[in-house]
Structures are given as structure tokens and as C-alpha cells.
A protein has these predicted regions:
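Active-site-adjacent loops and short helices of periplasmic peptidoglycan-processing enzymes
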Residues: 60-243, 253-256
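Intrinsically disordered, low-complexity segments enriched in small/polar residues
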Residues: 4, 26-30, 58, 64-65, ...
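Residues at secondary-structure transition points
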Residues: 12, 34-38, 233, 303, ...
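Generic alpha-helical secondary structure signal
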Residues: 13, 40, 171, 202-206, ...
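Domain-terminus/edge residues, biased toward the C-terminal soluble/receptor-binding domains
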Residues: 217, 234-432
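Ser/Thr/Gly/Pro-rich low-complexity, disordered linker/stalk segments of secreted
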Residues: 1-74
Length: 432
């Protein structure tokens, strides 16, 4: 198994010198934009890439992602709605140095990489760390996802993508985090930092850097809670590498809250007139090739960045691409990676395959057949071992009850589990 290559310990001084080089390298008018591709342009790119693939592009879209139900739109068709409009449009990138990428399975098997250790501005990918730090504080009991948090003068009118709010508007902390991962709302990111940092955003950013260090992200430095450019913050760019962002993404998809929120196609809030304000996900690849998240990011000096996480059967992949010139290129490059992956995937077991008999403790039948709930794949060149686990169910069994697990292992380490389901109803002993 190959892990991210070339990562080295870097002091803050070393990182600061890299930032200076990056700032000097990237020139051009900051803040100016031109119209971006239309949605139909992006759909054409997606459809063209999908046509090149022999496999069904929806393969791997499962009813559950990591134990969390795949999310559906929250729009109520019976209520009036308005779609949110960005304050500013994304434009052309001024970054012209070539793509940076790191694509690997969750367990670290590298599928593709290029300039993966080159430091680069990451724009709104920064918000993933914002969310990770906040969830750490939730786990410690310092804040709650149910906290009612209100916008104030310091956090309301942050530029770029934003929630259309006014001072005094209040939201649950959970919904602010959802707005970060789904819509990339900058004012939400600042309000979260203000709330978790107890009124001090700099304190929160220090927590972001400590979390990066704890994860082993040795070439990453955060200056803001949202990833906005220097022209808007007066601070250095938030920077990282493709290989470091893979590490961050792996931590993110280990959290079921993030998996759930990242898979939502839209964010819906009711305004004071009972009108639904709809903020559509910026991830246009949801539910293609098993993609269920994770985050996009753009400013002119960073280009178009994107991390996606995909689950196809037992195979989970993280793909990091930085520095695309346009949104269309960002989409196209991600689809090419998954098209290449599809050509390397070998079906080991079909969904519904009979995996043998499983024990029942207190049923009229002592054994029952179990079938796989999902497909099992291997990537050519990356063989797995498999282990069947009998749960020896002691309760009532209905058709579809989980009665076992198929574990996928690599070098003895657990990679993933797929449920094995009962094929019939079985009554308990003594029942009529």
C-alpha cells in the first residue's frame, strides 16, 4: 500500500517562506470576475465524460453512505421557493501553473498524483477544517450542534458565497455547518469561528492549525476560517497540498455528520414570509460514480479546486484536484479520474450473492441464508482479503435484517464492511 509521498516536517518559518513565494508567484488583479460557465455548459461536460465510460455511472450509489441515509432534497413542493443568487460570480483563474492532484483509496492505495506536495492556495476547501474543528469542540462538550447562533456586525456581510441574512438572524450551529459544506457560505464560516472561538476568530484559526498538525498535515497553514483571498481579508492565503488535503478529507469522511451534510443536494431555509430559500449544492457530481461529497473552492489566485469522496460497493476513494482554470475543467478532470478508476475495477461479488448460512439463536430455524447488500470490487493491482462475520442474531429476523458482515481487509487492516442480509422472515421460538 502506497501512502502520500514526500511529506516532510515543516516549521512555521518554512511554511511562511513558501507562502511568500506563492504570493509572489501569483499575480493579477484580485477580486475582478468574468461570467462563469452556465449550468448547461457544465452538464454538457459531465454528459460527454459519462458517455466515454462503459460502466453505469450511477454504480455505487447506495441507499446508505457509512451508515447514513443518502440525502434527498428538502424542498417542500407545496410552499413557494426562491433560489439563492450569489453576490459575486466565479470567474477565470489567474493560476496557470498546472494541475495538482492526489487520488487514492481511503486506505491509501494511490491511483493518480501530480505535484501532490506543491503548496497551493486552497480557497474554500479551508471550510472542511473549520467544520472538523467545530465537531471536535462539540465532542468535547464546549458547544452543541443545537446552539442558537446569531449573526452580528463582524460576521454578517462577509463577501463571496453567503447566506442572505441580516444582523440578528439566528441559526442552529448544525445548520451553519451544513451551509458551509453544501453552499460554501463564508459568513456562516466566520460566525461559526466567532461562536466556537468565544468571540475571537483568531483563537479559532489557531485551533484549525493545531488540528492540521495533529492530523500530520505538514505543509498546511490557515489564516482565515473560510479561505477567502488576501484582497478580501488582508491576510495571507490559506495554503496546503493535494496530499495534505487527502489526509484532511480522510478525517472528514470518518465523521457521519460530514458524510450526511456533504451528500445533501440543497439547503432549504424558510424566511419570515414562509418562502423557501434554496441554496443548491456546489458539488455538481453528487451521485455520479458513487460520489457523495465533499467540497469545492475557488478564488482567482487558487483556481478551481475540488475534493470529492466516492463509495462504490466496498471501494472508497478520495480525489483532490487543485488549480483548474475553469469549473468545466475541474469537473472534467474529476470525471476522468473516476472513468480511469472504473476501467481498473474488477467485480468480485455481485449484489445479492448468497454468502452461505448464518446462525440464529432463538428462532424456529437455526440457520438462514444471507446475501450481500452491495457489490464487492477490487482495483487491479490492489488485491484484498475477505472475512465473513456471523452476527448470530438473537432477535426477530425479517427479510432484509442484517445478519452478517463481509469485511474487506488489506494487510490485515479493515478497509470496509458490507452488510449481509436475511433472505426471509423467521419467527422466534414459541411464537404463533
Amino acid at each position: 500500500t502506497e501512502a502520500p509521498s514526500g511529506a516532510t516536517e515543516s516549521s512555521d518559518d518554512t511554511i511562511d517562506s513558501i507562502i511568500d513565494e506563492t504570493n509572489n508567484e501569483i499575480t493579477g488583479s484580485e477580486g475582478g470576475t468574468v461570467p462563469s460557465e452556465t449550468n448547461s455548459d457544465i452538464e454538457n461536460i459531465i454528459n460527454a465524460e459519462l458517455e466515454k465510460t462503459k460502466l453505469d455511472p450511477t454504480q455505487g450509489v447506495t441507499p446508505k453512505v457509512g451508515g447514513v441515509e443518502t440525502q434527498k432534497s428538502k424542498i417542500d413542493p407545496k410552499k413557494p421557493l426562491q433560489y439563492a443568487v450569489d453576490r459575486e460570480k466565479e470567474g477565470l483563474s489567474k493560476y496557470k501553473e498546472g494541475l495538482l492532484k492526489f487520488v487514492a483509496t481511503k486506505e491509501g492505495y494511490v491511483l493518480d498524483k501530480n505535484l501532490e506536495n506543491k503548496v497551493h492556495p486552497i480557497a474554500s476547501l479551508t471550510k472542511v477544517m473549520n467544520i472538523l474543528v467545530t465537531l471536535d469542540e462539540v465532542e468535547k462538550g464546549n458547544v452543541s450542534l443545537e446552539d442558537n447562533v446569531c449573526f452580528n456586525p463582524q460576521t454578517t456581510n462577509i463577501g463571496g458565497s453567503w447566506l442572505n441574512v441580516k444582523i440578528g438572524d439566528c441559526y442552529k450551529l448544525k445548520d451553519l455547518l451544513r451551509s458551509e459544506i453544501i453552499y460554501s457560505a463564508n459568513n456562516s464560516a466566520y460566525l461559526v469561528a466567532y461562536h466556537v472561538g468565544k468571540g475571537d476568530i483568531e483563537t479559532f484559526v489557531k485551533k484549525m492549525n493545531q488540528k492540521a498538525k495533529d492530523l500530520g498535515m505538514t505543509n498546511t497553514k490557515f489564516y482565515t476560517p473560510a479561505g477567502l483571498p488576501t484582497s478580501m481579508t488582508g491576510k495571507n492565503f490559506d495554503i496546503s497540498t493535494a496530499s495534505d488535503l487527502y489526509i484532511m478529507a480522510k478525517a472528514a469522511i470518518s465523521n457521519n455528520n460530514i458524510r450526511e451534510w456533504a451528500s445533501e443536494p440543497d439547503l432549504v431555509f424558510l424566511n419570515s414570509n414562509n418562502i423557501q430559500i434554496v441554496y443548491k449544492s456546489r458539488n455538481k457530481l453528487l451521485n455520479r460514480y458513487g460520489i457523495y461529497g465533499l467540497k469545492t473552492g475557488f478564488h482567482e489566485q487558487a483556481g478551481y479546486n475540488m475534493i470529492v469522496a466516492s463509495k462504490q460497493g466496498n471501494i472508497e476513494v478520495i480525489s483532490v484536484i487543485l488549480g483548474a482554470n475553469t469549473e468545466a475543467q475541474r469537473i472534467s478532470e474529476q470525471l476522468k479520474e473516476f472513468r480511469a478508476l472504473s476501467s481498473r475495477m474488477k467485480l468480485v461479488y455481485s449484489k445479492g450473492k448468497n454468502m452461505g448460512q448464518f446462525n440464529l439463536k432463538y428462532a424456529v430455524k437455526r440457520k438462514i441464508d444471507g446475501v450481500l447488500s452491495d457489490k464487492i470490487y477490487e482495483i487491479v493491482g490492489n488485491n484484498y482479503e475477505y472475512k465473513i462475520k456471523d452476527l448470530k442474531i438473537k432477535t426477530v429476523v425479517k427479510k432484509g435484517t442484517v445478519i452478517g458482515k463481509l469485511e474487506t481487509l488489506k494487510d490485515g487492516n479493515l478497509v470496509s464492511t458490507v452488510d449481509i442480509l436475511a433472505t426471509e422472515d423467521v419467527k422466534e421460538l414459541g411464537s404463533v
